[in-house]
Amino acid sequence: MRFLMLFFIGVLGVGFSQTELDLKDLEKKPAGIVRDYYLWRYISDKKTTLENAKKAYELTQNKNSTLQKAMQEKGVENSEKSPDVKLPEDIYCKQITLESMLETTDAFQASCIAIALKSKIRDFDKIPLQTFKPLQEKIKEAYPVLYEELEILQSKNVSASLFKANAQVFSALFNHLSYEKKLQIFEKHIPIKELNRLLDENYPAFNRLIYQVILDPKLDHFKDALAKSNATQSNAQTFFILGINEILRKKTSKALKYFERSEEVVKDDDFSKDRAVFWQYLASKKKKTLERLSQSPALNLYSLYASRKLKTTPSYRIISRIQNLSQEDPPFNTHDPFLWQIFKEKTLSLKDEGAFNAMLKSLYYEKSAPELTYLLSQRNKDKIYYYLSPYEGIIEWQNTDERAMAYAIARQESFLLPALISRSFALGLMQIMPFNVGPFAKSLGMDNIDLNDMFNPNIALKFGNYYLNHLKKEFNHPLFVAYAYNAGPGFLRRWLESSKRFKEKNHFEPWLSMELMPYSETRMYGFRVMLNYLIYQEIFGNFIPIDTFLEQTLNSKDKP
């Protein structure tokens, strides 16, 4: 415990006023998402000079699109004031023209030339060869994959050359091409032998590409070729989506083989394993398969479906309340993102169970129950799943549905942690995006709201619940509300209108439509939030049959 108290003294000693962002203070903070977020705020501040913004940008760990945009805008704003300050390489080299780069080639490192070439691949057809070729030669040794991509683009038959490449080059070029160019290339003949070779290389980026192709609303020629292929050496996710591709073609027997392969190769991923078993059940309707799924030690929508369908007792445990928690304040401010990051990283780094449990003792307070259960879940050896409902009393719930949906979203977004920041800088308990804070505050009639207020659950829960109720006015099923909360209502509206999803009734639906959500994050989000929603409903005294609940998506008025 002496170590524990010394640790807290150290943590509290580096307290930091987050309303005044100072570069010297930020330099002393631990690297990670939290510091990146505050560096973004510092860069975005009108008072920050271009030179200091550049120093801040160089401190960031993950230079996401939000940071890049802020740095780029800072450069535009200060181009006349600071003409001698060059933007960071990853931004500057995208902006420079290949023609001007060619004039002073020796002044640029290969890394900068590579960044410039990658950013121009989409417009490859418009670039003269005499401009392009000398720059390509400059990156041949340092960037062989990019060099090969450019060689393929110069070939007479791009499609044929692409399928002769290895999976690394293929996937790199695929990701650099414009969508229009992909449609053009993949309408050409696709050699099945070469496609099988690429599939069996089991290269991660190529595997992700296959998932993307099968979920694409077009690229039908590529999908047809995949249906003619026979992958044998891939990973669980690729085998699974190849099985879905066969389901779409009503080839149930071949789909079943892919689902079996998916289960066979899965490693340390209960969700993927249970998904493969569940789809084996849908494809075969064998009760034994469903029984096997019901015995899964993991909690997910598939295993919950199986245990409820068969009315069996699952092997996992759900806990909705931690007993004997203190009503006093915990020893550190759980609303401070830096303090939570430091405490979390230190605790999870402890290999000794005794030391780990000693750290947890400092969290046995009602106000730090989310932090406690989060850390316990990270060492989830006993397959215990925590479904707390803290922060009660903040909102006077209209009904159980509103309450269950708010907690279902909060648990998925943040595990109910108030001081969480995502890689895209979504904030707090309900992961509100910074650009939504002002509009939401105005709609709620709240003045003087700062982004840091999103770390206060008393405010964040109201903001998130407001947005959920707003979405419910358009989307009348919790699944669609969850999709819209994650990916935006505009995207969901367009997808539901343009796709065939959630419109057909057969024994694969609505599970098939759920698997065909094109955004991977949103797809997983839907499965997890619906699981949370059903469990919270049951905790709050309202048992909902899964079949009936999900089938309502097929009758939804959300779609034309």
Task: Name each model-derived stretch.
Residues 483-542:
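Catalytic and substrate-binding regions of cell-wall glycan-acting enzymes that process beta-1,4-linked
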Residues 405-406, 423-447, 459-468, 490-491, ...:
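Substrate-binding/active-site groove segments that recognize
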Residues 213-214, 246, 284:
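Residue at a conserved register position within TPR or TPR-like alpha-solenoid repeats
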Residues 260-265, 295-298:
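Amphipathic alpha-helical segments of tetratricopeptide repeats
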Residues 19-20, 29-37, 45-52, 59-112, ...:
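Generic helix N-cap/helix-start motif at coil->alpha-helix transitions
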Residues 356-416, 465:
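Export/targeting segments at the very N-terminus of extracytoplasmic proteins
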